[in-house]
Amino acid sequence: MVYDSDVDVLRAFMGSGITVIVHTTNALLPMLASDISVATAWINTNIAPFAATISHISVGNEVLGTNNQSQYSMFLNSAIHNVYNALVSVNLHESILVSTTHAAAVLDPSSFPPSLGHFSSDIVPNIMPILNFLSSTGAPFMVNVYPFIAYIASSQNIELPYALGSGNVQISDFNSGLIYTSLFDAQVDTFISAIEKLGFGNISLIVTETGWPSYGHPSATLANAQAYNAYILEHVASSRGTPKRPSTPIQTQIFALFNENQK
């Protein structure tokens, strides 16, 4: 995951065999939405020269459902279409897929268990055209999944080994009968349920961020971060998928490569 289109970073990945997801900044959304020539210029400068190493573009990050980014929500759908059409103009729309990244805030707070996952009612008008776009282009729904955040918000109800994916805890979804052994799987399947409830069961899902902090909270320790990251690496490598979508690999990025201790 490359936040913003830093050409020096993208150049460094050229020839490495590693493909990356490039984000546009949220602040750029109004310009991308208002004029396709802006999107075309951005693609020609920041994407086309490095196309061999870019797999996806995320137009914005956590724009919907987060109060501090709500000023950009009205521009999101148009920006996505203009970026896609700019890729079409240089014949890169089949090799580079366009989507946008969502936080758990787009889900209704009552989305438990996973089979009852659904989007907040105020989000649906904004997310429906995005789902239509993803369905028609074959692009994935992108989500940031953080069991740590859910755990510290409800530690009295969530066991730490379940949040870390490192124990023998089993939680049954009373509605579907599926058994969950990790909060990560439960959160991913909650998003999938929400997508399916709107009629888009054909859309795949990518986890664009997940991780566990190592400082700043009693449960944010090096040992816990190591345990969680080891679990994620094993889970992704196994391609076992989730209870709702077994044997379906989950493309996942660990956040972050470096310590953001000043964030």
Language-model region placement:
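Short amphipathic alpha-helices and their capping/turn segments at secondary-structure boundaries
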Residues: 7-14, 43-49, 88-89, 128-136, ...
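Catalytic beta/alpha-barrel core
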Residues: 1-5
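Substrate-binding cleft of extracellular glycoside hydrolase catalytic domains
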Residues: 10-108, 112-122, 207
